[in-house]
Amino acid sequence: LHDALPIYKNVKNRGISGDICMGVYDRLDPIVKGKPAKIFLLIGINDVSRGTSADKIISEISMIVRKIKQESPKTKLYLQSVLPVNDCYGMFNGHTSRWQVVKQINDLLEPLAVKEGAAYIDLYSHFVEKETGKMNPVYTNDGLHLLGKGYLLWRDIVKPYVDQK
């Protein structure tokens, strides 16, 4: 997504491939010390692959949110829903075989955002096939990672929030 928004010179991508909620939490100090204007958080799918429950993932996201609010109270926080996955490819089975957990996380994430005064960005409904509850194959070729078309859709969804003053 960072590469799809090249005109934003002050945007920093702090995502790490394979990261989990507590990995984000443990790396927050230098980020919040910089008092960023905005933080866009999308985390949880790798926790799913480790067998972590939706409730535990939400608890850990809540810890992240509280730390950001405490250490950088003026930072506007955007919680992005976890993207759907699709198990039809036979790849990334730790993630894709637990596709129902993603919906459970998102059902809990939106109320968390409201409770904590964060904005909630619903990515899930744009990427999911309504009939199956799984990621639309138009956006992936492995059931987990986005193709270019998926990144462009994500960019189009997030851009208004990036542009917001």
Regions from the language model: what does each represent?
Residues G15-I16, I43-V48, V82, V128:
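Cell-envelope and extracellular/periplasmic
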Residues K35-G44, P73:
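Proline-aspartate-enriched helix->loop->beta-strand connector
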